[in-house]
Amino acid sequence: MDLKQYVTIVPDFPKPGIMFKDITTLMDKGEVYKYATDQIVEYAREKKIDIVVGPEARGFIIGCPVAYALGVGFAPVRKEGKLPREVVRVEYGLEYGKDVLTMHKDAIKPGQRVLITDDLLATGGTIRATIQLVEQLGGVVAGIAFLIELTELEGRKKLEGYDILALMQF
């Protein structure tokens, strides 16, 4: 199935010059969303995943159905102040400043094999920070899966040494 035909390109969103890749037009078609999810599940099965991790918010949209299909748990990565219990945190650079991602301190057990999921790989900053959180907790990043990779932003370079699946490249 050609998944690209189900992604809507929205010019100048959220600001002029950006060609936003809208995945809601993929997700609102059950058979297409299922197909995309199944592709990631197949990839994850080969990796013997113990838990799926995804950054808010669209990492949840991809990761939760994958975790469900695999029969494993899902651990959210959230911005600072959004998780109610003790967390580990990592600060990471943005184009104009810094941001912080957090994860519950007990979300990953040492040695667990982790699949990280997100909707889109752009610069790689968010996923690099997510990897740092997983590894701080002793998890092993067995794979990283995206619906979309924006190749011209070269985010894959920040993730060298990790196994990556991108279902579509733009």
Curated annotation (Swiss-Prot):
Record note on quaternary structure: Homodimer.
The species this protein belongs to is Geobacillus sp. (strain WCH70)
Q: What is the role of this chain? A: Catalyzes a salvage reaction resulting in the formation of AMP, that is energically less costly than de novo synthesis.
Give the family from UniProt: Belongs to the purine/pyrimidine phosphoribosyltransferase family.
Name the pathway.
Purine metabolism; AMP biosynthesis via salvage pathway; AMP from adenine: step 1/1
Q: Where in or outside the cell is it found?
A: Cytoplasm
Q: What is this protein called?
A: Adenine phosphoribosyltransferase
Task: Tell me which CDD domains the record gives.
Answer: PRTases_typeI
**Enzyme Commission identifier(s):** 2.4.2.7
NCBIfam families in UniProt: apt, PRK02304.1-2, PRK02304.1-3, PRK02304.1-5
- Pfam families (UniProt xref): Pribosyltran
Q: Which GO terms describe its cellular component?
A: cytoplasm
Q: Name the gene.
A: apt
Upper lineage: Bacteria, Bacillati, Bacillota, Bacilli, Bacillales
Keywords, comma-separated and alphabetical: Cytoplasm, Glycosyltransferase, Purine salvage, Transferase
Q: Which domain of life is it from?
A: Bacteria
Protein transport recorded as keyword: no
Gene Ontology process terms (BP): adenine salvage; AMP salvage; purine ribonucleoside salvage
- MF terms (GO), sorted A to Z: adenine binding; adenine phosphoribosyltransferase activity; AMP binding
**SUPFAM superfamilies, per this entry?**
PRTase-like
